[in-house]
Amino acid sequence: LIEAFRQNQCTNRLISTLLRFFFYLLYGSMAWTYDWVAGFVSRGLWQEWVLEVAADLRGPKVLELGHGPGHLQKALFEKGIGICGIDSSRQMGRLAHKRLKTGGLEPNLVNGFAQHLPFASGSFAQVVATFPTEYIVDAGTLAEVRRVLDRAGELVVMPVAWITGKRLLERAAAYLFHVTGQAPEWDDRALDPVRETGFKVEIERRKLKSSELLIIHARKI
């Protein structure tokens, strides 16, 4: 039994290492495949999930952390919201820039890290992140987010989604999400660093047709 447990731990570490390398490529040299891969593993729901958050953003100025290929950027531009974006991936920056320019929009994108936001204090009413990695609860990130938010500012995060549909392809997608660690069981303790930084946290589970989203609203106190 102990040996089986150890083998399982080794397997999980190997899978985790391989996934980290895969995502490193996906945000780097293979960024051009991001939309296809995200759409495939989510059964085409990925963009719908990202755009669902647009309803929670009122502006007038919003900063998106990890803007990726720019789908939310475009949606907020079209809503008339003043939107900025920052991403550590230059490749993602190029994809988002092209998407916005093609739509006749003027990008306001920065290459950089959430722990060092190049914006003045109190610049934004809201900061948003969809499917961020663990950087979102880093002490440096949270301190910077709090700094750039105005006095009544809010951090909006969608960290995870679950595919709940019962059709064969939906069940297969849910399984793929589970084994790749993209749909973990939620543990509210993950938000302790957010609360400790001076935010009041509200958690919403939003049910869609064949999926469920976890959306976090964290307001400055």
Regions found by a protein language model. Give the residues of each.
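A short SAM/SAH-binding and catalytic strip from SAM-dependent methyltransferases
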Residues: 126-137
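Short alpha-helix
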Residues: 182-197
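Core SAM-dependent methyltransferase catalytic element
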Residues: 203-221
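Class I SAM-dependent methyltransferase SAM/SAH-binding core
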Residues: 63-65, 69-116
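A short acidic, Gly/Pro-enriched loop at the edge of an enzyme's catalytic core
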Residues: 115-126
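A short glycine-rich, Lys/Arg-flanked "PGG" loop and its adjoining helix->strand segment in the class I
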Residues: 140-151
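Conserved class I S-adenosyl-L-methionine
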Residues: 5-57, 71, 170-173, 177
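Conserved beta-strand signature within the Rossmann-like core of class I S-adenosyl-L-methionine
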Residues: 152-159
